[in-house]
C-alpha cells in the first residue's frame, strides 16, 4: 500500500528499480548471493504488478452490493455531518398527495404522488446555476474541493461513488466522473445502464443541466434506495400494465401526471439504440448542449427499465412567483417519479394533488402522437 500512495519511498525503489548495481551494498556480494537477491526482488515486483492489475480491474467494475453497503456505513460512521442528515431524514415529514383511483378525476390522470418536507434540500432546490454563479464557486464534485471526510469508491474506471450529504432517499449516492466535464448524458448512457444492472437495490438516475442538476458543470449520475419514489415503487402493480406502444422497442406511459417514455431490455446495445432514437427526437433549445430530460433506471428481473422524462422547462412558474403564490419546487428525476421535494414547510402544507400534477405537466414536454404508434413531433 505504501508504494501505491507515494512516488518516493523505500518500497518504491525496492519494487521498481528492482536491481542494485555497482556502488551499493550488493556489489560486494558473491554472484550467487546477488542472483538470489535479484530473484527475490523480481518476485516482489511480480507480486506488486499482479496486485495493481487486480486493483485496476476492480476499478473498472461496479462495486458489489456488499461493497456499496460497507462503504455507506463507513461513510456515515466517519462523517458526522452527513450521518446527522441521514438520521434527520428518517424523521422528515411526508404526505401522500393522492392514491391511485383518487386522482382519476384530477386532469384524468391515474397517479400516486407524494411530497417530502426536506429543509436540507434547499441547497439544491435554491441553487443558482447561472453561468456567472458557477464560474464564481468551486466545483463541489471535484476531488480537491470535497470535504476531507468524504471518500470515494471507484466505479467503471471513470466514476466515483460518493455518499450524498444532503439525502432525499435512505441511501443516496452521487456518482461523478473523475474528470471535471460538463453534465451531459451523451457518451454516458451505457454507464447508467451498467450501474443500474449491477446495483439492483438502487434506482439510478440522471438530471439534465436544466432539469434538476445543481452541479451542471460536472458530469454526475445519482443512485438511491428503491421502493420510495411512487412511480418506481408502484411500477409493476399500477403503471407497467398501462404502457402503450410509442416506437419500435419504446413504450409510452400516459396514465400518469406527465407522459413518460419507457425502454425495457436486458441488451445494452439495444437500450442505447432506443435511447438514441429518443435523444434525436427531442428538441434542442438555443444555447444548450443537449435536449432537456430526466432519466431513471432500475433492474427488473433480467431487464433494465429506463424511464425518460422529456422536459420543456427547468422550473415551473410558481417557483418564481411572489408572496403566497410561490411554491419553491424545482423538479428533478425523483420529483418526476412522483416524490416532490419541498424544502419549505409552507410549500409542503400548501401543496395539493392538483398543484403537483400541474407542476409536473408544466415542466414536461408532451409528444404529439401519430395514431398511438410513434411520435410526429415534440
Model regions and ranges:
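Active-site microenvironments that recognize anionic phosphate/pyrophosphate groups
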Residues: 1-191, 214, 226-364, 378
Amino acid at each position: 500500500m505504501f508504494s501505491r500512495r507515494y512516488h518516493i519511498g523505500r518500497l518504491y525503489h525496492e519494487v521498481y528499480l528492482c536491481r542494485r548495481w555497482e556502488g551499493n551494498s550488493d556489489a560486494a556480494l558473491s554472484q550467487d548471493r546477488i542472483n538470489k537477491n535479484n530473484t527475490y526482488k523480481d518476485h516482489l515486483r511480480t507480486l506488486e504488478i499482479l496486485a495493481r492489475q487486480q486493483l485496476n480491474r476492480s476499478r473498472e467494475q461496479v462495486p458489489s452490493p456488499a461493497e456499496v453497503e460497507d462503504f455507506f456505513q463507513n461513510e456515515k460512521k466517519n462523517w458526522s455531518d452527513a450521518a446527522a442528515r441521514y438520521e434527520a431524514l428518517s424523521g422528515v415529514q411526508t404526505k401522500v398527495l393522492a392514491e391511485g383511483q383518487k386522482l382519476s378525476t384530477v386532469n384524468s390522470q391515474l397517479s400516486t404522488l407524494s411530497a417530502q418536507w426536506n429543509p436540507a434540500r434547499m441547497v439544491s432546490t435554491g441553487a443558482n446555476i447561472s453561468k456567472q454563479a458557477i464560474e464564481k464557486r468551486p466545483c463541489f464534485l471535484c476531488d480537491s474541493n470535497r470535504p476531507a471526510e468524504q471518500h470515494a469508491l471507484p466505479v467503471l474506471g471513470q466514476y466515483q461513488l460518493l455518499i450524498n450529504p444532503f439525502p432525499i432517499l435512505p441511501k443516496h449516492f452521487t456518482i461523478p466522473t473523475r474528470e471535471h466535464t460538463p453534465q451531459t448524458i451523451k457518451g454516458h448512457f451505457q454507464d447508467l445502464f451498467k450501474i443500474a444492472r449491477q446495483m439492483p437495490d438502487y434506482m439510478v438516475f440522471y438530471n439534465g443541466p436544466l432539469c434538476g442538476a445543481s452541479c451542471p458543470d460536472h458530469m454526475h449520475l445519482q443512485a438511491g434506495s428503491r421502493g420510495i419514489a411512487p412511480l418506481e415503487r408502484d411500477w409493476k402493480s399500477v403503471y407497467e400494465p398501462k404502457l402503450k406502444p410509442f416506437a419500435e422497442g419504446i413504450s409510452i406511459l400516459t396514465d400518469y401526471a406527465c407522459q413518460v417514455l419507457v425502454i425495457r431490455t436486458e441488451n445494452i446495445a439495444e437500450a442505447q439504440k432506443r435511447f438514441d432514437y429518443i435523444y434525436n427526437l427531442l428538441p434542442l433549445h438555443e444555447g444548450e448542449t443537449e435536449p432537456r430530460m430526466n432519466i431513471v433506471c432500475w433492474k427488473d428481473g433480467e431487464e433494465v427499465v429506463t424511464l425518460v422524462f422529456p422536459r420543456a422547462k427547468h422550473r415551473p412558474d410558481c417557483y418564481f412567483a411572489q408572496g403566497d403564490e410561490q411554491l419553491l419546487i424545482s423538479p428533478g428525476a425523483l420529483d418526476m417519479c412522483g416524490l416532490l421535494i419541498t424544502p419549505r414547510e409552507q410549500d409542503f402544507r400548501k401543496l395539493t394533488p392538483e398543484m403537483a400534477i400541474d407542476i409536473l405537466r408544466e415542466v414536461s414536454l408532451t409528444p404529439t402522437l401519430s395514431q398511438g404508434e410513434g411520435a410526429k413531433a415534440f
